[in-house]
């Protein structure tokens, strides 16, 4: 399991940044609001950011005594990695290297949908995200690692992702199966079995629960 988007605030890297601020070698490794919006963010910019939690994806931390708004997609304890930075990429590749050295054959990319931030976008499953996924898959192939993507998203996004990686989770199956069992109508789940990606991993439940988003309307495009 490789967590692409974030790492613990208790990690040695982030603790070094807290102590040394911009003097830390790891300073570029973590995203702040200003690193994504160097010229400031408008209300529209901030409102357009997709986040699976209430509120904005920032929390206050002091870097060598100076307050900074650190990007946190999930919780204040999970600080987001700048996957564009050399240090951020080196960290992710160190995980791949360790997995390969441990004879792992499959690697799951956790929260990768949030891993590529860009001003003026939703910062979730954007074209930049797909470039990140492709880059990670290329590195996986070099190390003999097959890539499994973990993304809760609109089903058409899942189909698109599946064409670019080795495996995706079939998160749409659990709610559709429950619907069939509770209503007696099997048409929706039967239709899904016709269009689901052939490289999908069957899922019946997860530690996050059963997600309605995976069979709902597109959270980023209400016209769909």
PLM features: residue spans?
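Acidic/aromatic-lined carbohydrate-recognition and catalytic surfaces
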Residues: 1-90, 97, 101, 112-183
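Hydrophobic residues within beta-strands of alpha/beta enzymes
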Residues: 107-109
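Active-site-proximal substrate-binding groove within the catalytic cores of carbohydrate-active enzymes
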Residues: 187-224
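Short, flexible coil/linker segments at or flanking structured domains
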Residues: 69-71, 95, 135, 189-200
